[in-house]
Amino acid sequence: TDARATDGLTEALERASAFIEDGADITFVEAPLSIEEMCKIPVALNGTPQLVNLVVGGKTPILALDELGEMGFSLVLYANVALQAAVHGMQIALGQLKETGKMDQDGPLASFLERQRMVRKDHFDKLEQRYAF
């Protein structure tokens, strides 16, 4: 529930409790604003598995995975972390290219072989050979 933002933590916990009463296996109280609020959520919801969403630059404090587990969160979303890291890497690589006029092959780049592995190129080449006419 995103009720925390509009109606406060108490209302969000009441809604999550209602979802649990209706059979929810897990609940998600969006955007707790402090560690204190984060600690209250799993306790107030009597051990029902909880999801927490961590956004770099967001409202919820960023804590270590083990701390979140100790609090009672069983699923953690690291929203946008891969995208933000990729954008940062792109900015560095393209900034170097703009500044120097050449690619820095030893810079913040995955190797060509790593790129091919990540996109499963061999797998798709085999599919192409199998199904192409």
Which residue ranges define each predicted feature?
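Alpha/beta enzyme core
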Residues: 1-96, 130-133
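Extended, intrinsically disordered, low-complexity segments
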Residues: 83-133
